[in-house]
Amino acid sequence: MEPPYVDHYFDGALMHIFNPDTKENGGIFSQTQGWAILAESLLGHGDRAFEYFLESSPANMNDKAEVRILEPYVHGQFTESTRSPYAGRSHVHWLTGTGSTVMVGCVEGICGMRPNAEGLVISPSIPHTWDGFKIEKNFRGKHLSIDIQNPDHVQSGVKSMTVNGEAVEGNFVCEC
């Protein structure tokens, strides 16, 4: 929100009760980062999805620890924006859904592990520089060793895959 409200009163809208550039009054909320990762993945933009993951990673902000003022391994709910005297400071780190939305963006988006009623769709969207990756996953009582190779260095699309050492047709693992 730009510009933030500077007059404080409460009419039912939260933006009026917070200082400018914090929380709902112009702060930068983090929870949407996971959805951006997932959206780019679903569009097949593996490079951009992984770029968003890296940009939102708490570890990526360790060189700004004195500004961020949070543990180096947690997401904050929001970050104070540029007009704040504390621009870049993050808050409410143990009371946010950011970690879970980023996890969904990474697991279901980048790694492409999307469960449905019949089984598991595997449709990764990865950086074109990756040669592939392996995942060990327990899924509905079964252990899966999934090996995804990317010899053509594409960002999305599954030509073939192996699960528990056996070739699987398509990109679906049946629950049966």
What residues fall within each predicted segment?
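Short, mixed-charge aromatic SLiMs
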Residues: 9, 57-67, 125-137
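Carbohydrate-active enzyme catalytic cores, enriched for enzymes
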Residues: 22, 33, 43, 78-176
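Alpha-helical support elements that line or immediately flank enzyme active sites
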Residues: 33-49, 53-56
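Extended glycan-interaction surfaces of carbohydrate-active proteins
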Residues: 1-29, 61-86, 156
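Catalytic and substrate-binding regions of extracellular carbohydrate-active enzymes
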Residues: 13-14, 27-28, 51-57, 172-173
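A generic secondary-structure signal for well-formed alpha-helical elements
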Residues: 44-47, 56-64, 110-114
